[in-house]
Amino acid sequence: NPREIYEWLLKWLACPMQNPGIKMQTAVLMHGPEGTGKNTFFGAIRAIYERYGGIFDQVQLESQFNGIFSGKLFGIGNEVVSRAELYHQQGRMRNMITETEWPINEKNLPARMEQNHCNMVFFSNRIDIAKLDPDDRRYCVIWTPEPADPSLYLEAKSELADGGAAALHWH
């Protein structure tokens, strides 16, 4: 039911903002064609978090140096779950999603344990989405609709450029 998914997603996004530091035990996996507004919408959410929000790619996910995740409350993984060979990364991703502590390993510094408050959203445009177990409760997979009229996205980007992320935060 699209309405139930919409309401679940809004609550999933609101909960960490209303309860700073809470670690959700699920990640959102947005899947759908290019041009459906995934980056635009979640970019606005990331803007609310300011320096505590981050975006990462496949290379950063696979790197032994994960300092990019240090201190983050919200993370966007752009196209990090779209390759069939990503199966070997599933354990790492599960830990990122559910563990309350994680090791942070920055280059030329000793590794350290840090509280994990980072709630994750992953994007994929491709059909060969990550291998998920049918009973895996860690992901909410949301299939986006086909792209809307381009004017909708232009209007949204204009609104965001005019303080829309701050308005969204107070909505």
Per-region residue spans from a language model:
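Conserved phosphate-binding loops in nucleotide/dinucleotide-binding enzymes
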Residues: P150-A161
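P-loop NTPase catalytic core of nucleic-acid-dependent motor ATPases
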Residues: N1-G77, C140-T144, L168-H171
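Short secondary-structure boundary/capping segments
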Residues: I48, R92-M93, D135-R138, A156-K157
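Short, polar loop motifs at secondary-structure junctions
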Residues: N125-D128
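A short helix-turn-beta junction within AAA+ P-loop NTPase domains corresponding to the substrate/partner-engaging
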Residues: A130-D149
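Conserved nucleotide-sensing/catalytic segment adjacent to the nucleotide-binding pocket
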Residues: G54, N66-N119
